[in-house]
């Protein structure tokens, strides 16, 4: 990539229909894990006008008793879907439950790996990526980091009553200008937020007071002032946005995988996270790859780092562990790959133990990004191996 360029990432709010589905799926995973942390869960959710459908596979101890319908309603309530005017109301919506158990054919390979019978095998084949860079203190790419913060603030101001005309659904997009390969300024901010009907002058034009409130109360308090140089603001650029959430679009678990990760700054293996227990390497190995990449950057061994891992179903050991630093590493990438394999156990059991993943910690991950957040449950954000890696690299 050229040294001077524009790069864009987007995020969506907790009230976006796909994120509603993600949060319900992870709330159900957490509820099952509270009673059986070794359960196998693949919880999928569909949301539409007045309807939630819960499907997938859950295998747990016989004594596990989870009120799936109530969890779906509680999640809708927390997000803010508490009024029939919004197209879905936690009190009156229909909730269908259609769970099966995990296939025995899959379970036999996960329970005992073909290459190591003392370890569990990967729950599926696939490839996963982790990434870190020095653009922000959180070691995340700046565009996705700030896109998340915008919709997070939209929800905060909606819920605390400071901007009472806001409704749950919203999307943000940040276009960053890079100079010499580093963030220089923000070229464009797009923020589209659902609102009460009185905020538009015409179907195609928002009130000036609405636009001013969004810019002054949501956008400017979040973005670094030094980056707001001739920045263009596009606020509800199509105009009226009253119909939103599951009424505006059908929501499905796993449809916001780039929002969930790095905003397009690195490749994605294609597997979604929400609703999946950590025996599914789609989730756990992606978390581990972030942990590895972040520790490499925190150690000062590279300014940016991309990790690829790949697995075969029923096999514990990864097919490959590959490090790319795009020329920013202080030692060759192949030496970094060797260090990673020496100091990180990337077998499924190793990941679960290393990151303490058999806990009900997942609902919080399902909105505003799985990475780059300072939450005590997010063990994959620790940089506790940075000093070890630096010493092992000879620094």
Swiss-Prot record:
Binding-site positions, K(+): 44
Annotated binding of ATP, by residue: 16, 169-171, 240-241, 249, 255-256, 272, 276
GO cellular component annotations of the record: cytoplasm
Catalytic reaction list: L-methionine + ATP + H2O = S-adenosyl-L-methionine + phosphate + diphosphate
Region (Flexible loop): 102-112
GO MF, one annotated term: methionine adenosyltransferase activity
Note describing how the cofactor binds: Binds 2 divalent ions per subunit.
Broad EC category: transferase
Residues binding L-methionine: 57, 102, 249, 280
Involved pathway(s): Amino-acid biosynthesis; S-adenosyl-L-methionine biosynthesis; S-adenosyl-L-methionine from L-methionine: step 1/1
Cofactor: Mg(2+); K(+)
Positions bound to Mg(2+): 18
Cell compartments where the protein resides: Cytoplasm
Gene3D superfamilies in alphabetical order: 3.30.300.10
Assembly and binders: Homotetramer; dimer of dimers.
Protein name: S-adenosylmethionine synthase
Organism: Polaromonas naphthalenivorans (strain CJ2)
């Amino acid at each position: 990539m050229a040294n001077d360029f524009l790069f864009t990432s987007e995020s969506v709010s907790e009230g976006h229909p796909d994120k509603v589905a993600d949060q319900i799926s992870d709330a159900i995973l957490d509820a099952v894990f509270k009673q059986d942390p070794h359960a196998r869960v693949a919880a999928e959710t569909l949301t539409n006008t007045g309807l939630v459908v819960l499907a997938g596979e859950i295998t747990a101890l016989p004594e596990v008793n989870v009120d799936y319908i109530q969890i779906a309603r509680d999640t809708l309530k927390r997000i803010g879907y508490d009024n029939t005017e919004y197209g879905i109301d936690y009190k009156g919506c229909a909730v269908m439950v259609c769970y099966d158990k995990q296939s025995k054919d899959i379970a036999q390979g996960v329970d005992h790996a073909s290459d190591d019978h003392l370890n569990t095998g990967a729950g599926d084949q696939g490839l996963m990526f982790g990434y870190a860079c020095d653009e922000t203190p959180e070691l995340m790419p700046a565009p996705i980091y700030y896109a998340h913060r915008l919709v997070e603030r939209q929800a905060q101001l909606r819920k605390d009553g400071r901007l009472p005309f806001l409704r749950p659904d919203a999307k943000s997009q940040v276009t960053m200008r890079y100079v010499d390969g580093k963030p220089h300024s923000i070229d464009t901010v797009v923020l589209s937020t659902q609102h009460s009907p009185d905020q538009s002058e015409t179907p195609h034009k928002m009130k000036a007071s609405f636009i001013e409130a969004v810019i002054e109360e949501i956008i400017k308090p979040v973005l670094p002032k030094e980056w707001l140089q001739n920045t263009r603001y596009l606020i509800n650029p199509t105009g009226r946005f009253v119909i939103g959430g599951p009424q505006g679009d059908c929501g499905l678990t796993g449809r916001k995988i780039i929002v969930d990760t790095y905003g397009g700054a690195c490749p994605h293996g294609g597997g979604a996270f929400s609703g999946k227990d950590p025996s599914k390497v789609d989730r756990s190995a992606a978390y581990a790859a972030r942990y590895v990449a972040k520790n490499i950057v925190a150690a000062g061994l590279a300014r940016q780092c991309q990790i690829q891992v790949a697995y075969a179903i029923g096999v514990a050991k990864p097919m490959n562990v590959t490090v790319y630093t795009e020329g920013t590493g202080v030692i060759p990438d192949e030496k970094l790959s060797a260090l990673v394999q020496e100091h990180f156990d990337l077998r499924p059991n190793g990941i679960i133990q290393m990151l303490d993943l058999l806990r009900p910690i997942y609902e919080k991950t399902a909105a505003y990004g799985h990475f780059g957040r300072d939450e005590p449950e997010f063990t994959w954000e620790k940089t506790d191996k940075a000093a070890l890696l630096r010493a092992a690299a000879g620094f």
